[in-house]
């Protein structure tokens, strides 16, 4: 089955759910209707719907159709189970996104940083610091490290837009897996300087290790979030 076909259908239906063309608790069009609309096979439609189920957007009901269970929320909603770019998250939440690069340099992984990040000591890395604005507020401080061997040609201009878009569509590398750790920490002087803290003295910190299709670590990132706009969502299914 062509991956691009079912992914295109998945993204199309997902976008319509987020736009509330298919509102919460409504039923999606029947399989036959979707097959006709997208000019595809039944298996392709079912694969697209399975992706939406995995994302928590719909729930299948045996013999009764597919019900929408996605609800838009007021806070910025990140997903734990998927890998999204900042721009994709902003679009999904209907927010205006701006990225400002505050540091862009090359560093060498020290023994201490190698133990923390998973890179090897002596690895040459891009070190990128970016402030993420949503609807005009500085809410996220991203501190990224990319292995230069796997991300050649990265520039500050690219970093101000989407590094993942560059990696996937220019370099042709597949981004497959991200391991995440979420904690709460006291805000640092850097957080208070760069983020709109609104009186908070702590930040939510998401640490990511991201791997390509060969299972190689190419990114280590620490994202520091202003708490008032921090909300991560996961989907859990009970198995018996």
Task: Give the positions of each predicted feature.
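Extreme N-terminal segment that seeds HTH/winged-HTH DNA-binding domains in transcriptional regulators
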Residues: 1-42
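Short, cationic-aromatic polyanion-contact patches
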Residues: 4-6, 30, 67-81
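Conserved hydrophobic residue
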Residues: 22-23, 58, 138
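Short, hydrophobic-biased segments on the C-terminal half of alpha helices
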Residues: 49-50
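Beta-hairpin "wing" of winged helix-turn-helix
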Residues: 54-63, 69
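Extended, compositionally biased flexible segments
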Residues: 59-60, 84-87, 91-95
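C-terminal all-alpha effector/ligand-binding and dimerization domain
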Residues: 96-240
């Amino acid at each position: 089955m062509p991956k691009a076909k079912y992914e295109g259908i998945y993204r199309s239906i997902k976008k319509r759910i987020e736009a509330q063309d298919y509102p919460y608790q409504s039923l999606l069009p029947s399989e036959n209707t979707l097959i006709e609309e997208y000019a595809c096979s039944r298996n392709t439609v079912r694969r697209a719907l399975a992706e939406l189920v995995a994302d928590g957007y719909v729930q299948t009901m045996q013999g009764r159709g597919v019900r929408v269970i996605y609800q838009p929320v007021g806070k910025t909603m990140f997903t734990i189970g998927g890998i999204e770019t900042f721009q994709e998250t902003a679009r999904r939440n209907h927010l205006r996104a701006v990225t400002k690069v505050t540091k862009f340099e090359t560093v060498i992984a020290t023994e201490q940083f190698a133990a923390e990040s998973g890179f090897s000591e002596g690895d040459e890395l891009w070190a990128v610091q970016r402030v993420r604005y949503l609807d005009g507020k500085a809410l996220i401080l991203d501190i990224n490290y990319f292995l230069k061997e796997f991300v050649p040609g990265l520039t500050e201009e690219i970093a101000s837009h989407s590094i993942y878009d560059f990696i996937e569509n220019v370099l042709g590398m597949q981004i497959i897996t991200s391991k995440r750790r979420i904690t709460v920490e006291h805000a640092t002087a850097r957080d208070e300087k760069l983020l709109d803290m609104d009186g908070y003295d702590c930040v939510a910190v998401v640490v990511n290790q991201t791997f390509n299709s060969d299972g190689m670590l190419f990114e280590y990132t620490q994202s520091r979030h202003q708490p008032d706009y921090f909300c991560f969502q996961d989907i859990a299914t009970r198995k018996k």
